[in-house]
């Protein structure tokens, strides 16, 4: 899954307060830092897949990209993959502190490395975006969902996620959303015109389905496939309920 850069709603976007566009180095050679994912390279989640594809794509276009991973591992704290430099940042394993501690420390590190653009992924890690702004950095926030709506986040965590949302809406030079519903949300709640860039998939050569047939006994058109995280907000229970009501002989 990659993030395309060709879809926008409306056709152009500039903050009403006249925020600057980030040029000055002819774009090529520009230093970009990415903060918010858990690991790189990784396919553990949508954020990680998108960061991996976007970072590698920018490197191929001549940008210098640093991605900040969460957690320190002996001997693997700084490494380069596909031309992308990955730096691991200490953080606590406790879920309520993980993204918060990591995003602040990663921001401070990025500020010491003369990055031109700091790109935050998800609203939780975007709280220190305002610090990057104070240091004159061009900031981008890609909203990967309104995480405070997820049932597992309550109390302090939910309030912190809402804070990240407000910071991104008010201070990010560029605010990117992945769906029209989120575009409408930021327009209506914050009067903020975001950039709509839906996620996309890489087209690959189709492979024969022998393995699926041999391993699972499935034939084309004989099953319904759900691909996604098993969590309430993804609606798997709705899928199961609908499947039972359909009285179909297809496998789920």
Residue positions per predicted region:
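A short helix/loop element that forms part of the nucleotide-sugar donor recognition site in Leloir-type
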Residues: 206-218
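Membrane-proximal helix-turn-helix segments that form the acceptor-binding/catalytic region
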Residues: 108-111, 134, 158-175
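A structural motif in glycosyltransferase catalytic domains
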Residues: 51, 224, 239-240, 252
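N-terminal subdomain of nucleotide-sugar transferases
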Residues: 13, 21-72, 244-247
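Carbohydrate-associated surface elements
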Residues: 181, 200
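A short, charged, and often flexible helix/loop element on the N-terminal side
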Residues: 82-108, 151-157
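Conserved donor-binding/catalytic core segment of Leloir-type glycosyltransferases
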Residues: 33, 218-234, 240-247
């Amino acid at each position: 899954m990659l993030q395309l850069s060709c879809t926008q709603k409306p056709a152009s976007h500039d903050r009403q307060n006249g925020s600057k566009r980030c040029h000055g180095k002819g774009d090529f050679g520009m230093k970009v830092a990415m903060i918010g994912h858990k690991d790189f390279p990784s396919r553990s989640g949508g954020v990680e897949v998108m960061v991996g594809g976007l970072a590698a794509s920018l490197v191929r276009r001549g940008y210098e990209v640093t991605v900040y991973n969460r957690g320190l591992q002996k001997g693997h704290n700084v490494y380069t993959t596909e031309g992308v430099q990955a730096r691991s940042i200490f953080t606590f394993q406790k879920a309520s502190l993980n993204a918060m501690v990591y995003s602040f420390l990663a921001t401070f590190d990025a500020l010491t490395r003369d990055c031109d653009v700091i790109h935050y992924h998800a609203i939780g890690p975007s709280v220190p975006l305002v610090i990057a702004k104070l240091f004159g950095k061009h900031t981008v926030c890609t909203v990967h969902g309104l995480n405070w709506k997820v049932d597992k986040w309550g109390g302090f965590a939910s309030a912190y996620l809402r804070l990240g949302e407000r910071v991104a809406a008010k201070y990010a030079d560029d605010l990117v959303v992945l769906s029209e519903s989120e575009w409408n949300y930021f327009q209506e709640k914050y009067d903020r015109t975001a950039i709509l860039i839906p996620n996309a998939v890489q087209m690959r050569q189709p492979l024969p389905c022998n393995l699926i047939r041999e391993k699972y006994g499935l034939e084309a058109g004989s099953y319904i496939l759900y691909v996604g995280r098993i969590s309430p907000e993804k609606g798997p229970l709705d899928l199961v309920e609908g499947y039972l009501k359909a009285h179909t002989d297809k496998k789920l």
